[in-house]
Amino acid sequence: MRAVSWHCLTDLRSFFSWCEQKGYCEINPCVAAMPSKAKRKQIMEAKRGRRKLQALTPVEVKKLLTYCETEEPTLTPYACLCVFGGLRPEREAPNMIDEDITAEAITVPEEFAKDNETRIIEPLSPNFIKWINHIKRREGSFQQVPNLKRKWIKAKKSIGRDWPHDCLRHSYASYHFAEYNDAGLTAKNLGHPDSTLLRKDYNGAVTKAQAKAFWAILPTHCR
């Protein structure tokens, strides 16, 4: 059973349990279909294994940001918002402007957020604040990037391996949870509705040492 199917089945089981309590049904039809405890553990271990491959290493993040800084500086703001802010790369990060970003917090406007609700990302890590200050000293600063898709295709090659699906969001989630050990905070910043699921998915995805190295990446390291 795929993990996504299991999670859907878990939601259905909760719904039918409520129906049982209210007398809307006699039995919960999902109970018999639920995987065993051993099978659930196997599913989660496999998923965490995939998360480790989907997260970029600190070295790969440095390679990416070094490419942006030296070859295409207009990409640096976009890359930092995805890497250190956890913004969605297709809709959120490309549309951020200076007014949305301060050294205290990032505001994702409702028209760009996936759930159509304004999201505040805070607190920001010390290294991210240094990146923000570094970027805002430049002309143009945070704004939409012309030819973003074409430029980003080239930038992704800098890590030296195939680009994992949605790896920047997975990287942020993995390193943020490892650093702060607060699934609720990580889920809130990502715009995820379920902190319990996030905790299961990202617990042990990266080590504390890796998280420390990730959150220590500074602009001076990528020139």
Range-by-range predicted roles:
Residues R2-T10, Q21-E90, R169:
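Basic, Lys/Arg- and aromatic-enriched nucleic-acid-binding interface segment
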Residues A3, C80, F84, R91, ...:
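C-terminal catalytic core of tyrosine-transesterase DNA break-rejoin enzymes
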Residues R13-F16, E20, V206:
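C-terminal flanking helix
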Residues A32-K41, E60, P94-K130:
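Conserved tyrosine-mediated DNA breakage-rejoining catalytic core shared by Y-recombinases
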Residues V61, P123-R161, Y172:
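Active-site/catalytic core of tyrosine-dependent DNA strand-transfer enzymes
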Residues E99-A105, D162, N181-D201:
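Short, polar N-cap/turn motifs at the start of nucleic acid-interacting alpha helices
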Residues E110-N116, I129, L190-W215:
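Catalytic-site neighborhood detector that most strongly recognizes the C-terminal catalytic loop/helix
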Residues R138, K212-R223:
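C-terminal secondary-structure termini that scaffold catalytic or DNA-interacting sites
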